[in-house]
UniProtKB/Swiss-Prot annotation:
Homooligomer. Rep binds to repeated DNA motifs (iterons). Forms the O-complex, which is a Rep-DNA complex involved in the initiation of RCR. Part of the C- and V-complexes which are RepA-Rep-DNA complexes involved in the c-sense and v-sense transcription. A motif (Nuclear localization signal) lies at residues 292-303. ATP binds at residues 229-236. This is Replication-associated protein. Residues 252-270 are annotated as: Transactivation. Transmembrane segments: none annotated. A motif (RCR-1) lies at residues 18-21. A divalent metal cation binds at residues 52, 60, 62, 104.
Amino acid sequence: MASSSSNRQFSHRNANTFLTYPKCPENPEIACQMIWELVVRWIPKYILCAREAHKDGSLHLHALLQTEKPVRISDSRFFDINGFHPNIQSAKSVNRVRDYILKEPLAVFERGTFIPRKSPFLGKSDSEVKEKKPSKDEIMRDIISHSTSKEEYLSMIQKELPFDWSTKLQYFEYSANKLFPEIQEEFTNPHPPSSPDLLCNESINDWLQPNIFQSSDERSRKQSLYIVGPTRTGKSTWARSLGVHNYWQNNVDWSSYNEDAIYNIVDDIPFKFCPCWKQLVGCQRDFIVNPKYGKKKKVQKKSKPTIILANSDEDWMKEMTPGQLEYFEANCIIYIMSPGEKWYSPPELPPTEAVHSDRS
């Protein structure tokens, strides 16, 4: 994200495409037909699909596609079929890719005529080829082309480059996350909606509408919300029920930051232990963070509000300098809870005996 490579838009341009669908039980024949139809404009000449099994028994699908004109796409989900998302690679050596796909297939389907490419070692004897030791670049290129998941990618590196694996594991984990990103599942809110029982609901509703529920101009800047009050009053459950969010408790971990979140929650973290508090409270854009076990990266492409939740004994405002407090008050709606207030409605009382007797 902070690196230049991660800011580049996805792009694939090649007449030979190698696709890997991890955890995909799709029938190879059906997959072939669907992929073939996707690339009609580039005049498909050949496709091979094979279904294989991981060691854990789960299924994955490999596909080699050859077209007359180079496939040119900028949408990383162009080759998605029935909800399955592939790793998209250029097949630099179609002969090797085809051999790899056909090594241990459970089911295979082909369409068209395979177009072989000349071997890069053409003209050399077998002994010369065997004596040539592959470079690290060649080993990594082979691993990138043939791995089907994060686990397999790291396992192949550990096997082929054990010293590099043991000394540079965090960099390989970073590249594994880039090659095999987690597909965001459709958000299902596990926290039921609640109606706060407050003395001043209006101030909260006035904050919710423009900052959470209403879409706004990307150039506009949101405003954060600070809630301080007793424990066991439903603050966290209410805050988490509003929609997709980044949630931090005890510490702020940027490694799993979700750009698609609508807002952030800082829950029960003392002021002195909240890094980038100004950027979060001020709903700033495009600031740099430093994850504990990763590279620095740029986050928050658009302005996002932050809900800060604190108990009375760790009130942020008591820890701030006058200058910090001035910034905080300018960028935050502050709600200090009164005795008896809750962030959920009180349960309905059961009918009295008198009501029962009247109905009878």
